[in-house]
Swiss-Prot record:
The modification Phosphoserine is found at S134. InterPro entries: PP2A_PR55, PP2A_PR55_CS, WD40/YVTN_repeat-like_dom_sf, WD40_repeat_dom_sf, WD40_rpt. SUPFAM superfamilies: WD40 repeat-like. It comes from Schizosaccharomyces pombe (strain 972 / ATCC 24843) (Fission yeast). The lineage of its organism: Eukaryota, Fungi, Dikarya, Ascomycota, Taphrinomycotina. This is Protein phosphatase PP2A regulatory subunit B.
Length: 463
């Protein structure tokens, strides 16, 4: 256990991007809505509610984990559906990188209705260096050209190099409901997109049609009892994918069974104690995100109060349940009134599958070991992505206190550290419910994480 505690203390604030103003001054369009490392970890992409995608590149000239601005482009624009009289937001719901096959980068981005495949590449800009109209070679006062030696043919010179982005494909008009997930297959040729009631299978090179592989829409919408909340392909087996539902279950599908995957090959469901059921039970059991482990052996699911780790070979119960917000059970009525109970927190595995990460309120996020021999509250650490990290880093030379980590679920005994990465007691009366960590991504090969905190992107690392 000492080794675990030593490793927890190594986490430190590395970087922060974004406006450092007060929360009250934040523009809605600047709020980050998606974060994703690429398959190498050298590039990091974020999407925001203004429809923009910003890319960062690893700065290898610096020690530790540090990124620099790479490029930015407008991915989606606001639209209007005249048939349904609905506005379609430009907000980026998900970003997924495609595996790199040449010098160009490819990534998928989606809003509620339209998915786009973007190509990003280095483009040389050239300018005309000289010709006979150039002031240095000819003017009206010199008269007409009389000899061939006076002729100056236009010549192009290298002027600058930019990162160009253009939509290679646009996959539109395939979803009647809001898209909540996209996932690229391990075959690097296909991907899925999921909305509330359907999942479609696409070929990356074909944008005008897709195959509907899951459809849970009842004939009578009054009989609707659940919606799809998240979907993902298996990281190794290209025939397997899973999706989660608002009923709190996860269904594993095999594309080889049938064209329409109505019957899952496995159903993962944690049976709730009937005596503890309440009005809020169905809401808090709704799964907001699911992820496969890197080796495909385990599944991580996040509902409002817990993280659960499932073995794909064991459907009856999770191998580990990690309580996150038990102190909020007494506040569920208030959280229902202010809609916080419907917040959709994401979750992710570490690159080595030894830890998992998910967010909380007051800009807290937790890192937890996956070892099922440890109790759910053992060996965990809670960090805070806050602007105090800036101020602390600038005053690091002035005896900044050591990073404090929450161990063994001792929430209230730890003071807040000046590094901005300390535990903050999860007293439900003192939590800031406007500051929440909904989106995060873990570097594929090292212990570095990217955290979206409102309009700021934080990077924490052990390096």
């Amino acid at each position: 256990m000492d080794d675990i505690e030593d490793s927890l203390d190594q986490w430190k604030f590395a970087q922060c991007f974004g406006d450092k103003g007060d929360v009250e001054d934040i523009t809605e369009a600047d709020i980050i809505s998606a974060v994703e490392f690429d398959h190498t970890g050298d590039y990091l992409a974020t999407g925001d509610k203004g429809g923009r995608v910003v890319l960062f590149e690893r700065n290898h000239s610096k020690k530790g984990c540090e990124y620099k601005f790479f490029t930015e482009f407008q991915s989606h624009e606001p639209e209007f559906d005249y048939l349904k009289s609905l506005e379609i937001e430009e907000k980026i719901n998900k970003i997924r990188w495609c595996k790199r096959t040449n010098r160009a980068h490819f990534l998928l981005s989606t809003n509620d209705k339209t998915i786009k495949l973007w190509k990003l590449y280095e483009k040389n800009l050239k300018v005309v260096a000289e010709n006979n109209l150039s002031d240095s070679f000819h003017s009206p006062m010199q008269g007409p050209l009389t000899t061939p030696s006076q002729l100056r043919l236009p010549r192009l010179n290298h002027h600058d190099m930019i990162i160009a982005a253009y939509p290679r494909r646009v996959y539109a008009n395939a979803h009647a409901y809001h898209i909540n997930s996209i996932s690229v297959n391990s075959d690097a040729e296909t991907y899925i997109s999921a909305d509330d009631l359907r999942i479609n299978l696409w070929n990356l090179s074909i944008s005008d049609h897709s195959f509907n592989i899951v459809d849970i829409k009842p004939e009578n919408m009054e009989e609707l009892t659940e919606v799809i909340t998240s979907a993902e392909f298996h990281p190794i087996n290209c025939n397997h994918l899973m999706y989660s539902s608002s009923k709190g279950n996860i269904k594993l599908l095999d594309l080889r069974q049938s064209a329409l995957c109505d019957n899952p090959c496995k159903l993962f469901e944690d049976q709730e104690d009937q005596d503890s059921k309440s009005f809020f039970s169905e809401i808090i059991s709704s799964i907001s995100d699911v992820k496969f482990s890197q080796n495909g052996r385990y599944i991580l699911s996040r509902d409002y109060l817990t993280l659960k780790i499932w073995d794909v070979n064991m459907e009856k119960a999770p191998v580990k349940t990690i309580p996150l917000h038990d102190v909020l059970r007494s506040k569920l009525c208030d959280l229902y009134e202010n809609d916080c109970i419907f917040d959709k927190f994401e979750c992710t595995f570490s690159g080595d599958d030894k830890h998992v990460l998910s967010g909380s309120y007051s800009n807290n996020f937790g890192i937890y070991p996956t070892d099922s021999s440890l109790p759910g509250d053992r060996g965990q650490i809670v960090l805070q992505a806050d602007k105090a990290a800036f101020r602390a880093r600038k005053s690091a030379a002035n005896n900044v206190p050591k990073l404090n980590a929450v161990k063994n679920n001792d929430w209230r005994s730890q003071p807040q550290a000046a590094m901005g990465s300390a535990s903050v007691g999860l007293d439900p009366d003192n939590l800031d419910y406007n500051k929440k960590i909904l989106h995060a991504s873990w570097h594929p090969f090292e212990d570095s994480v990217a955290i979206a905190a409102t309009n700021n992107l934080f990077v924490f690392s052990k390096l």
